[in-house]
Amino acid sequence: MNIPELFGCNVFNDVVMRSTLPKDVYKSLRKTIDNGERIDMSIADSVANAMKDWATSKGATHYTHWFQPLTNLTAEKHDSFIEPVGNDEVIMQLTGKSLIVGEPDASSFPSGGSRETFAARGYTAWDPTSPAFVKEGTLYIPTIFVSYTGETLDKKAPLLKSMTAIDRATKRILKLFGIECAKVNTTVGPEQEYFLVDKKLYEQRKDLVLTGRTLFGAPSCKGQEMDDHYFGALKPRVADFMRDLDETLWKYGVLSKSKHNEAAPAQHELAPIFSTMNVAVDSNQLTMDVMKKVALRHDMVCLLHEKPFAGVNGSGKHNNWSLSTTGLNLLDPGPHPESNTLFMLVLACIIKAVDKYQGLLRACIASAGNDHRLGGGEAPPAILSVYLGDELGAIVDSIVMGKDYVPKRAIKGSIGVPESPIFPIDSTDRNRTSPFAFTGNKFEFRMLGSSQNIALPNTVLNTAVAESFRQFADVLENAKNFDTALAKLIKETFKNHKRILFDGNGYSDDWQKEAAARGLANLPTSVDAYKTFMSEKNVELFSSLGVMSETEMRSREEIYFENYAKIINIEALTMIEMVSRDIVPAVSAYTRDLADAAEI
């Protein structure tokens, strides 16, 4: 297997575009992708025809506008390429209009009351910055989804708007440092956890089939108490699944990188390489879909529920978030972070954003499934805090106290074996209990549930940080002395938001008390978190940056509450049915058998 040749073979990527599009069309499309410029409608027919020719050469007969409604899933309607030309003949055709705009029925998707049941018209619009791909005989075209009246009905449109907001705000900051760039990219790498169970055993469990988790059961004699499953040797059946999964994902251009056993029995993880945010969101949705289908090929079922089994760890999805432009990662502190004023400014903006919007960040990852994980001694607590590590924490302290930072001498590590290499020791340890941790050149948002679409958490992060950047730029652009104003702004921000910084054990009861003393939000359940979503400052945040209107936010709040209630109701009905049809009859039969045996 030649992996470089295999990778992206089913994707209408840059290599394919360069070879199939006229030069001027290719250049125009690249400007849209690379610089965020509006698509030139005059190139639509040319791009559509090239896509169709390429897709049909891959065996595709249909195309679909692939979008992400306000569920955690994707949606698709398949239309064939055939067009009648008379004399009972057809041709294969994809027009520019069909590429750019679709018109699915919007009445049956969640709208949170923003649309009447009879109001059916909705539109899908092509996202040219995320590549199309061929899967199972269909050309998948990534799109956004809006209503006839213009409200967004999906998770991707607000994400793209938030990417625009943070791009514009960050460029203002960079310009103050003499850095000109065409575009600032937000990048993400979501670490996907999941369980694998035998298909025959799965089908015997009504609760697993209907709810994704076991509602009744006894603890296993052996769980994860021996700590021997994490990073353990892969069992042949699991290894075959992972090999098949990697190859399938690589064909779709998904940067699947790491795979390993997780802490709980039958639990595993897949981690990709970072990619541009909207592409990463699409890739993660595709990954979850492919996981389920590949598992079935191996007579297994992939469980993405956050807590499929009581008594062992549940599954999350660490969201590795960063900001970069050409040749520059804005979250790379460099060898001397204390003198890297751009990095310290970016760090201050992020800390301010997390502190100010604790409730919103908690709400954006809330779900009925995730409630079983958060604060349970296996996942981050439900209280937001930021972990910076020893070095950055000490630098922040020195800035707040107005003292010079004295860096520690670099330490080289050795395990004492002559043959082993000498290796550098990182400047900080890792804190696995932190919900929002700095890990070298990125922030790791660890509160997401495994089944969650990562669009909303990243929309919130982008928007909150963009507001901080915009506010900082307003101050610095009007400063008489830039360096003095910059130093003052960084110091004041660290001082005002230092309460959100925590490097201790997030699982401890002491942290609950300390967090309350600091005035941090403690929202233990999803319902508690959802109640904060429509706060005045949250509405102002999204509306002022053009990411979501108050109407769009209110519809989402309605959907969150409704979805939560429906999940709990389904679980309750499933429990009632299992008790009445399975458990009680089984107990009755068993007691009858015992009684008959006693008579004998």
Positions of predicted regions on the chain:
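Active-site core of metal-dependent hydrolases
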Residues: L6-A119
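Substrate-recognition/cap regions that form aromatic- and gly/pro-loop-enriched pockets
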Residues: F561-I600
